Amino acid sequence: MSTAALLTLVRSGGNQVRRRVLLRARGLQDDRWVMPTCHSSTSEPKWSRFDPDGSGRPATWDNFGIWDNRLEEPILLPPSIKYGKPIPKVSLQNVGSASQIGKRKENEDRFGFAQLTNEVLYFAVYDGHGGPAAADFCHTHMEKCILDLLPKEENLETVLTLAFLEIDKTFARHAHLSADATLLTSGTTATVALLRDGIELVIASVGDSRAILCRKGKPMKLTIDHTPERKDEKERIKKCGGFVAWNSLGQPHVNGRLAMTRSLGDLDLKTSGVIAEPETKRIKLHHADDSFLVLTTDGINFMVNSQEICDFVNQCHDPNEAAHAVTEQAIQYGTEDNTTAVVVPFGAWGKYKNSEITFSFSRSFASSGRWA
C-alpha cells in the first residue's frame, strides 16, 4: 500500500486504522490489556488482546492481515507511513515468558525484555553454565550496554556485536578482580533480539540458545548453534590450540569441558578459541504472515524440534500460556535441564491455529532415548 493511500485511509473511511492512529496520537498506551500469568481451565477468564470479547475465540483478521476492529490496538504511525503499510505496535505486556528449573539443583537460565527507546525493543535469553554468575552479569548489564551504543551506531547488527564483546570484556575484568575463582569457569549462551519500528528484527547469538520466527505456520530458524560439530567452529578451536573430545554420550566438548564454541565468559577457554563474537541476522517482518518470535534455551531445543515449537505455540490462547506450554512439553519429553522460553506475538498471532500437532509417545518417557 502506498503512503498516500495509507494516509487517505486514515483520514477517511478506514475506521479501524483511524481509531488506532488516534489512540496512538493521544498517547494512550495499551496497558489496559493485562496478560494473565498463565492460562488454565480453573483460572478466572480475563479479557486480553487475544480474546477481546471474552468469547474464547481469537480476533478475526482484516484485509491488512492485522487484528480487526474488535481490537483497539494502535498502529505505529511513523513506521506505517515510512513503509507504506500498517505496522501494529508490539506491546511488552503481551510478551509471554516461562522458566523452569527441571531436574537441576539450580536454574541458571535468565531472560529479559524491555523497551530501550521509542523505536527499539529488547528480548533475550541466557543459559548459564558453571554457575549462574555469567548469565546474571549479562542479564544485569546487557540492556544498558546496548542502550549506550544505540545513539552512536545506526546498524543494529553492529550494535549487538559491540555489546557482546564489551560485556565479555567487562565480565573478564570483574572476574579477575574478584576473589571468587569459580568466575573464571562461569559462562553463558546469549541470544538477543532487537525490534526496531515494529518491523526490523535483528538477532545476535553465541552458544546454543535459539531464536525462531513462525512465518505462515512454519519455523524460520534465525540462529545456528555454535558447537564443535560445526566444521568451521572446530577448525578455529584447533587453530587456537584447543581440542575437541567426546563424552560418553557421543557429544563433542571443547577441551573436554564445554559443549559450545562461542559464549560469554568461560575465561579459561579464551586461549583455546572460544570467542564472544556473535553471529547476527537481520530480517524484515511481515505482520500478515509472521505469528511470533520465540527464544529458547537448550533444555527445550534438545527435546522439541522447531516445527513442534511452532505448533505448540500456535495452539495456545496467548503468548504466556504458549511459553509455559513449550517449557512443560520439554519436561514431558524428558529433559533434565532448565527450560526457558520467551514468546513475542506479531501481527499474525492466532492465524495459524489449525496447525497439526504430532505427539511422540516414545519421547514422553523420562529417558526419551536421548539420555539413555
UniProtKB/Swiss-Prot annotation:
Binding-site positions, Mn(2+) 2: 127, 298, 337
Enzyme Commission identifier(s): 3.1.3.16, 3.1.3.52
SUPFAM superfamilies named among the record's database cross-references: PP2C-like
GO molecular function: [3-methyl-2-oxobutanoate dehydrogenase (lipoamide)]-phosphatase activity; metal ion binding; protein serine/threonine phosphatase activity
Quaternary structure and interacting proteins, as annotated: Monomer. Interacts with E1 and E2 components of the branched-chain alpha-ketoacid dehydrogenase (BCKDH) complex; this interaction requires colocalization in mitochondria. Interacts with BCKDHA but not with BCKDHB of the E1 component. Interacts with the 24-meric E2 core composed of DBT monomers with a 24:1 stoichiometry; the N-terminal region (residues 49-61) of PPM1K and C-terminal linker of the lipoyl domain of DBT (residues 145-160) are critical for this interaction, whereas the lipoyl prosthetic group is dispensable.
Gene name per UniProt: PPM1K
Family of the protein in this entry: Belongs to the PP2C family.
Protein's recorded name: Protein phosphatase Mn(2+)-dependent 1K
